């Protein structure tokens, strides 16, 4: 039995109980727990050897196809070999071919039984008796004249199972050899009836001239005669290098020690060639084939078959050799093809595109000093750099292209009118009012729609977008115009940019008494970038110091040339407070729209537009202010806006009245979203809620990946020590009344530049009041909650007081920015500035056994102060730094300080002083960080 065996299997094989086997193993020094335990092959061999092998043969009634102790011979083999078997005289008893025993264990026979020369016609499957020591004293020196002729009268069996070779530990079964060996067993083989010296297949001399080198002498597992006819379970010493009269195993194949041996007591199945390896028991000697049995420890029993490599294998090997090595890792080599990746893609996504192993990309970046996991979002530069090293062109897909591809996967399009020219109808113009803060934009809209919106704004500053549609009576014709009011404060850049993209015409409001300001220039840039025509409204002409001509001259520098100066920009002087020239301004807007714009849309398609603003209402839930750009929005439609989706449950106009449908250029408030959409997100109507949910989920995942790639800190191995140092960090949780305000506040706060030592991090943001969940998060992360135009809800205030969480409320954005900036500056580590105190020259040195060297000094300037910091100068060269004046005396009295012009004695925390040295004292003063 080659390989491991269980105790109960051995007990069944040996015909004893498992307890007896366990006891016998314990006597042999082997610790085995139970009958289900396995023992190694050497242990099983020693166990069988201790039982003498007889019980094994009695228990095996038929040969086993997967026996572990040795290979058995098929019962049909003796019938095909009727010829007499040469060999020394032995007392051999033929056994029935129906029950051949297994090899190598042999049945117990009398030890003194000599070998018989009787013919062994049925003995091919009969185990050979062990030869006495006197019967085979050494190798038979018969000649080996090369290949021998086939044995007359003894045809080879058509198929036989050769025994396992010289390896007692082999777990593989021998392979059948139907074809005869081309090389005979060596030596003269007489015909039938002739005696020979090989009971197990003929003599095996140790060497044959011209066929093989001499076989080394020594122990050989599985070979050699056994003195006294004792059983030979699997191996033992083999003093003679020649033939093997193995009980139950047959002699080794003639020729040399690499030849295959025959089965139990029969002549070898083929001549021994030099092709098999040791352990190829029944293998043939033909070139290019393995031995019939396995080698030691499961290795193949012969030399592997070597074939010619295919062209594909050679090409793959060549390409692998030519593959680029990045960071010591061999990576695939591209042909310059373009790989499209989404923003925030991971190395797994990149590896999937190029059929590479993600682990190799991770290892390559790690060796280059970049620590990234396979599923972590990677920045665009890292992907492009890695792709360039492998000869790939990495193209990071823009968010717009990625969103378009996402919609195309659902057979949806955005931004195009369906149908032909006959389906398009005239729509009202969308006008955005832009300008610097406090220049009168909201007052102008109030005058147009006869409302008072400005008084409701905190500080008189518009902090969210307002969208209104008013009907203007122009020359007896009612013309609807949609107005969008944008903030003018510098923190609302993104909101102004959204207003410019969603508009048809921009009204630029400039105060005649203030002139062109930074946000005025920014509004001009946004409008020009969106290719939107601009109508300039010069406001506050009724105030003292107003100079409309000056405004025209200033705006000329930015490409806005008035029509009276030969340009194409329309300028209207107005007074929003007095209502002067408002109709002229509206007329200019209508004329500009009719003259230079094609304002048409298809109202019969599914609605599409943009979410101008969104907020969380306590009673109504998420509310989004949307502007319909094409199509008609109806109650009950399934909509998706950004990563929010839902079904339109209710629509409200600017007057608070319910509407059932909204046509193009109509702003309405939509109620029914499952979450708050982002300000500026595109919205569209889809057929089913399922499609809307899938689109929203994919957009949300894309946004998370992009955010992770943008906010992930690039930590290299060189910067790891500094990155692990403690840095001051201010965590914030932002809550506001609408999403646009929260977005603007976050951008303004993150734009505060204080120092690299402190970091501002917004860990959460949302629309609505401060909740207990926000307080718990702030408590766990040591964060401050910023509430903008909102208050704490319910028990959130009590929880915040109990947990020690600070909640700050603001209604004006620049107050929040100033206070957060001050808090960041207060978190800076202090910077100390050196302030000189005085200088003293050493005139004499006194030595003391208690305190060491005492310096007798004359204070030249300033003061000498006890415990002050000092440095020692010698010839204007600093000798020692960071010293301390440990003691200071004037005459014999201890003093705290000595002024200039006086002598003193002092000791330093430094003993190597000389006369003429100068002691300079200083103190460190904390400097305010800015």
From Swiss-Prot:
Pfam (any one): GTP_EFTU
Principal subcellular localisation of the protein: cytoplasm
Family of the protein in this entry: Belongs to the TRAFAC class translation factor GTPase superfamily. Classic translation factor GTPase family. IF-2 subfamily.
Leader peptide range in chain numbering: none
Region spans: G1: 435-442
Compositional bias segments (type: Pro residues): 81-120, 136-155, 180-191, 228-240
GO molecular function: GTP binding; GTPase activity; translation initiation factor activity
InterPro entries listed in its UniProt record: EF-G-like_DII, IF2_II, IF2_N, P-loop_NTPase, Small_GTP-bd, T_Tr_GTP-bd_dom, TF_IF2_bacterial-like, TIF_IF2
Residues annotated for GTP binding in this entry: 435-442, 485-489, 539-542
All residue ranges annotated as the tr-type G domain in the record: 426-598
Disulfide bridge positions per record: none
Highest classification ranks of the organism: Bacteria, Bacillati, Actinomycetota, Actinomycetes, Mycobacteriales
Gene Ontology CC entries for this record: cytosol
Record's keyword terms, sorted: Cytoplasm, GTP-binding, Initiation factor, Nucleotide-binding, Protein biosynthesis
Organism: Mycolicibacterium vanbaalenii (strain DSM 7251 / JCM 13017 / BCRC 16820 / KCTC 9966 / NRRL B-24157 / PYR-1) (Mycobacterium vanbaalenii)
Name this polypeptide is given: Translation initiation factor IF-2
Gly residues composition-biased segments: 192-204, 241-301
Subcellular location: Cytoplasm
Region (Disordered): 29-316
Region entry G3, spans: 485-488
